[in-house]
Amino acid sequence: MRRPRRPGGSGGSGGSGGLRLLVCLLLLSGRPGGCSAISAHGCLFDRRLCSHLEVCIQDGLFGQCQAGVGQARPLLQVTSPVLQRLQGVLRQLMSQGLSWHDDLTQHVISQEMERIPRLRPPEPHPRDRSGLVPRKPGPAGELLTQGNPTGSSPAAQGFPRPAGGRSWGGSPLSSLQAELLPPLLEHLLMPPQPPHPALTYEPALLQPYLFHQFGSRDGSRGSESSSGVVGVGHLSKAEGPALFSRSASKAILGTHSGHSFGDLTGPSPAQLFQDSGLLYMAQELPVPGRARAPRLPENGGNRAEDSSEGHEEEVLGGRGEKSPPQAAQPELSLQRLTAVLAGYGVELRQLTPEQFSTLLTLLQLLPKGTGRNLEGAVNVGGADVKKTIQQMQRGDPAEALPPTPSLPGYLTASPASSEVQQVLSPGFPEPPHTPSPLGSSSVLLEKKSPLGQSQPTVVGRPSARPSAEEYGYIVTDQKPLSLVAGVRLLEILAEHVHMSSGSFINISVVGPAVTFRIRHNEQNLSLADVTQQAGLVKSELEAQTGLQILQTGVGQREEAAEVLPRQAHGISPMRSVLLTLVALAGVAGLLVALAVALCMRHHSRQRDKERLAALGPEGAHGDTTFEYQDLCRQHMATKSLFNRAEGQPEPSRVSSVSSQFSDAAQASPSSHSSTPSWCEEPAQANMDISTGHMILAYMEDHLRNRDRLAKEWQALCAYQAEPNTCAAAQDESNIKKNRHPDFLPYDHARIKLKVESSPSRSDYINASPIIEHDPRMPAYIATQGPLSHTIADFWQMVWESGCTVIVMLTPLVEDGVKQCDRYWPDEGSSLYHVYEVNLVSEHIWCEDFLVRSFYLKNLQTQETRTLTQFHFLSWPAEGTPASTRPLLDFRRKVNKCYRGRSCPIIVHCSDGAGRTGTYILIDMVLNRMAKGVKEIDIAATLEHVRDQRPGLVRSKDQFEFALTAVAEEVNAILKALPQ
């Protein structure tokens, strides 16, 4: 016979994960129409492979469909190489999307099964063969005939002879397991169900991680039978009763203790399949046509109560017109039968006489005490099964399935076959509780409370167990701990405590810990004993596994999931040190951020003061008094060569402007001395209320209409002045006198200096006269901030134009960029060519602007003048002030400090365009309104000033700021007018 090939060949790669594919294939639902049911393999895992005329016979591995009982086939000799070979084959079939119902799957499996060696079962005793079917028809025979119409009765299956030489002779049902009573009852009471319709293939069932949803690694989902006990596993809601379940196949195989399964070499089947996903369980698709079909009672007697559907009452309602005879039956038997039927929602009066006689005979044939256990199982566990199925259908992984207790029986299995049982029970590992000893009349049942807590109940004796399930755990230093490493650790621990590795059940990994439970063992070791021994042999376990064991103990599942990871964290010193450092770094970061915020706030308050302090001489701020100004005036007067008495001021301050063009030395007229007047009376305006409101409404509408404002600005940008030549400014000798090459004065509108008085012997300076209405007298001179080599030209322009007011709109340095050179002395006096400038006072009016007073003396003519500089500090380059109020207050100070204006005001920023043009536009428009002009066109006014100097008002924001400032000033004027 051909030897099976080793893994790694064509059969597949083997190893963990392959058995997950095996389980998914075993759980695939649906049957293609072309699949033949003759000799179909896998019926132990999917009973729908066999038709209602076929039976599923045991072949030692998957099960095979056969028409009729026939002759028992030899069992397969399953060895480790065989299992590995099948694992690879099933993995390849799984990768192709095939299931048990596909022809290709059946063909391949058939070929592989032919290669497996066979074992001939021992010849049964003549009494055994005669005991399979009753010699005389009787109630028990009727029961088997009615209860198993599909041929799934134990006799039809050809049950092997029980171990120990027991036979089926004598009473036909004397050795029938108590677990088989509920299926027989259900087949007896319920009519045969039609076969399943073809189900569709569900790819989601192939997900290898369905274990976390319906698996039973944690021990809370699944069932276990003690050795040799036939257990009925959990079935989906859509699946009808079947004796050929996965747990049933495990019990059938367990009866062959005399075969060669205990002599296997190499790793045991349980070790091969444990980490390969064989314990995974998938939920079958519900069948609409079978939604009301009865389910196989779980736990050997726990039948789900479908009281809401009332299926049993509907089926039996028409059969029980008359009550069965009860007087002739023993009272005890009637009580037992009543208790059993109560679990199914059936009353005695609903039974036919034939059904009543059959059930009563069956109860009498059962061993004494079994009925009582069954009654408790039916009454206690029915509601839990229904709840469990509903939770599985909802896919709720948080609610654990109730454990399925096992009932005592007579079929036993050898230790060697128990390993094969684990392999052939893919969906059901061992139960989470320690089973009662064989033959005990007490059955431990566990109910699930609404909070998910396990509540064990013992039928027949008081409860001796705590209400919560306990698990042993071993915490390691490896996180996450793999399942393979956890199983390896438990195998080594089993060797040290002289236990079988199969004694560990419900093995799972929670973070760095492996949790487990202990089944009943020969040494009678409990969880506490095993964990204590693990602590004693800690060093040996660490040496053999390479893991560091941090803690061992016994606790609940919740503790293993929640408490253990925290303990592992607390044990690691490096982790605690890192967490402490991170926390300290976070606190330090918060403190640093708070300190930076406070420093920035303090710096913002001191920035203006420091900036103002840098503009003036040291120690000069406290000495600027009006007395000092008077002393300076007296000092400058005594130094006059002509020693004239100062005359009465003339109404016009430009009456002596012509003296600038005279070569003879002339006295300095008082008209060129600006007399400060710090009055705060409101400006006199010739605006009436109606005109003011009209202008204000127009300005507000202009500002609200953003589209109109944008179109107006676009038109202003497209405007070109005529003429617009700048030849003088672009001359090679004058290029270095320009701060910005884009803002140059027009040839027809520029200030010309006297060549004979200029140190550079040139008449050029980057300055433009701005005429308001009188071409003979400009109202403003717009100029750039003086450069270091043009300061003398600037003072010459101030002297020759007769200006007494300078409006400076830029700081000297902004964001590290020099905006303007200092053209006045820090303290005392400074000489610029022939012009001596003496700083008289520097007064900080507010945080936004300050005022300086100068004496300007021409050393050639010995003439002295007084002038005032208003320096605005809160206007950023190419931007606008944060509010219009500071600039409007600044403008009022400029206009109120001097009576009349007969000479131009010098206005400069850095480039002499953006901020300079905005201030001139605001002041010009407001002056026109103060004179009573009825029509105001700000855009036309801007075009007018741009005809005289290019680039005035550089941005749309500056233009909008000018409109806003005009509107607010008009509003202030209207409030000041008498109502």
From Swiss-Prot:
The record marks 448-449 as: Cleavage. Residues 709-969 form the Tyrosine-protein phosphatase domain. Residues 449-575, 601-732 are annotated as: Sufficient for dimerization of proICA512. The chain crosses the membrane at residues 576-600. Residues 145-155, 414-424 have a biased composition (Polar residues). Its main location: membrane. The modification Phosphoserine is found at residues 307-308. One of its GO terms (cellular component) is transport vesicle membrane. Detected in pituitary. Detected in brain (at protein level). Detected in brain. Weakly expressed in the colon, intestine, stomach and pancreas. Residues 1-37 form the signal peptide. One of its GO terms (biological process) is positive regulation of type B pancreatic cell proliferation. Keywords: Cell membrane, Cell projection, Cytoplasmic vesicle, Disulfide bond, Endosome, Glycoprotein, Isopeptide bond, Membrane, Nucleus, Phosphoprotein, Receptor, Signal, Synapse, Transcription, Transcription regulation, Transmembrane, Transmembrane helix, Ubl conjugation. It comes from the Eukaryota. This is Receptor-type tyrosine-protein phosphatase-like N. It comes from Mus musculus (Mouse).
